[in-house]
């Protein structure tokens, strides 16, 4: 069956996990998030295979960077482009938000299907682990920034506009933080399941079993930050290394910003992938 030429396909991926050695303070020139993102992009270009690497890099319509918590870069997309050796037609930065990476993939796929772009490089990363170690050791990190006047003269696009993270009802009640909001969601789910005959303890055990399965996958993933399989009981039992964060979520059930990691995707139209000679066995349909 022929593939529609405007079908979006992922043709390359790259991941970087940097684990700081020992407990010594980090050096001032420790790799920052944009350095890790650039490395992930190079890996993704290589992953695309064959001679397509250079051709893809020279034909990037959009470089989109998920905004970081680790550092205020001004324009992280500009820095990543320079470090990765890309000259994208458009530089895009997302607003803050945990949903931004997946939403960025979705919107990119729609733009490709609509014929608006042909090749996009998506990336994101954090070096919060190094940032916090440096702060504790009073080390001033020599990480890059784009000056305000440079940003003003040539600003990146802001993908999708700033997100509204709270409803007016939540704001009126002082509910702002994820640690407040997600337990409320969980309470609503438990209430609904309770009406269906599932008691809260059974529900929590089922959720913990799902998390235990996630940890099994992480245990065999060389890029996972916490590659250790946990039992369901370990997941839900509070302790010295697994404190209760927001009932019923313990620490291991929460997202973790305290990492040095990055990832990148190359997404393009099927037509462009064929023209660039990317082997079909490298295509993944998002």
Listing of model-derived features with the role each one plays in the protein:
Residues 102-110:
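Conserved phosphate-binding catalytic cores of ATP/NTP-utilizing and phosphoryl-transfer enzymes
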Residues 1-93, 110-117, 124-272, 276-286:
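Conserved "HGTGT" condensation-loop signature of ketosynthase/thiolase-family condensing enzymes
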Residues 100-103, 115-121:
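Elongated alpha-helical scaffolds
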């Amino acid at each position: 069956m022929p593939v529609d030429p405007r079908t979006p396909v992922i043709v390359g991926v790259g991941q970087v996990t940097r684990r700081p050695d020992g407990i010594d303070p980090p050096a001032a020139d420790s790799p920052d998030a944009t350095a890790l993102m650039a490395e992930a992009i190079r890996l993704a270009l290589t992953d695309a295979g064959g001679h397509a690497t250079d051709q893809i890099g020279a034909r990037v319509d959009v470089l989109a960077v998920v905004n970081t918590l680790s550092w205020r870069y001004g324009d992280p997309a500009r820095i990543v482009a320079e470090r990765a050796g890309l000259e994208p037609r458009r530089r895009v930065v997302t607003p803050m938000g945990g949903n931004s990476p997946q939403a960025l993939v979705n919107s990119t796929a729609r733009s490709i299907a609509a014929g608006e772009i042909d090749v996009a490089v998506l990336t994101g990363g954090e070096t919060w682990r190094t940032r916090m170690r440096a702060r504790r050791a009073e080390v001033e990190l020599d990480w890059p920034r784009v000056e305000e006047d440079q940003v003003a003269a040539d600003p990146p696009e802001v993908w999708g506009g700033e997100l509204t993270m709270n409803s007016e009802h939540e704001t009126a009640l002082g509910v702002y933080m994820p640690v407040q909001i997600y337990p409320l969601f969980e309470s609503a789910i438990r209430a609904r399941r309770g009406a269906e005959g599932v008691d809260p303890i059974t529900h929590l055990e089922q959720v913990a079993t799902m998390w235990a399965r996630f940890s099994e996958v992480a245990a065999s993933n060389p890029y996972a930050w916490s590659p250790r399989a946990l039992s369901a009981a370990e997941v839900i039992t509070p302790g010295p290394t697994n404190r209760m964060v927001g009932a019923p979520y313990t620490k291991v059930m929460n997202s973790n910003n305290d990492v040095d990691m990055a990832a990148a995707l190359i997404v393009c139209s099927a037509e462009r992938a064929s023209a660039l000679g990317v082997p079909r066995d490298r295509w993944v349909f998002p």
